[in-house]
């Protein structure tokens, strides 16, 4: 396997340990299950529909987003470096009858023989877990067709995001295991757009996501000061 240096073994091990709870709707990945309908809707609406399109989910983990995209008719490949999460994803896909190809590989290595192959590439909640986000973004750009879309989501780096995602979500509300995130690895929108601008991708849209702990509901917001997604498109 080539180009596998952009991997943090501690990050992989962290998600390996949590893999068995990936599909527990009230477990450690409950926030991802609550957030996923917003992610899916944003991807489907922005692209004009992913039915029948080839989609790659980079950093797919246990397959929450991958399965939801496959259920609405996308041809999905899921990519991750964690063997345990991938096994969970494969088993769950078998149980639910969803057809997804899961591959253990890095984005960089997978891109070597998938140049311009996908209509849509998603990279959600993944960039803050790798040593070199720029390398992943370039690989995602390489793998999407001209005119295709690449979606990224991550967390802004500021005092509010530290309070909400680490002090709040990990320590106070216990929504996530302590140590899930490292605030120093969060990425400001301006930084992410600069990384995108170094490729053939153009940022087309950005949207924030906010969580109400009283209602337990995620919703879109124009503010990108904590969780946010961007939609990019490859230049023809």
UniProtKB/Swiss-Prot annotation:
Pfam family name, one: Methyltransf_23
EC category name: transferase
Gene Ontology MF annotations: 2-polyprenyl-6-hydroxyphenol methylase activity; 3-demethylubiquinol 3-O-methyltransferase activity; polyprenyldihydroxybenzoate methyltransferase activity
Domain of life of the organism encoding this protein: Bacteria
Record keyword S-adenosyl-L-methionine present: yes
One of the GO BP terms on file: methylation
Pathway given in the UniProt record: Cofactor biosynthesis; ubiquinone biosynthesis
The keyword Ligase appears for this protein: no
Annotated positions binding S-adenosyl-L-methionine: 39, 59, 80, 124
Known EC number: 2.1.1.222, 2.1.1.64
Reaction(s) the record says it catalyses: a 3-demethylubiquinol + S-adenosyl-L-methionine = a ubiquinol + S-adenosyl-L-homocysteine + H(+); a 3-(all-trans-polyprenyl)benzene-1,2-diol + S-adenosyl-L-methionine = a 2-methoxy-6-(all-trans-polyprenyl)phenol + S-adenosyl-L-homocysteine + H(+)
InterPro entries: SAM-dependent_MTases_sf, UbiG_MeTrfase
Gene3D superfamilies on file: Vaccinia Virus protein VP39 (3.40.50.150)
UniProt KW keywords: Methyltransferase, S-adenosyl-L-methionine, Transferase, Ubiquinone biosynthesis
Coiled-coil intervals, chain numbering: none
HAMAP family the UniProt entry points to: UbiG
Family the UniProt entry places it in: Belongs to the methyltransferase superfamily. UbiG/COQ3 family.
NCBIfam families in the cross-refs: UbiG
Record function comment: O-methyltransferase that catalyzes the 2 O-methylation steps in the ubiquinone biosynthetic pathway.
Name of the featured protein: Ubiquinone biosynthesis O-methyltransferase
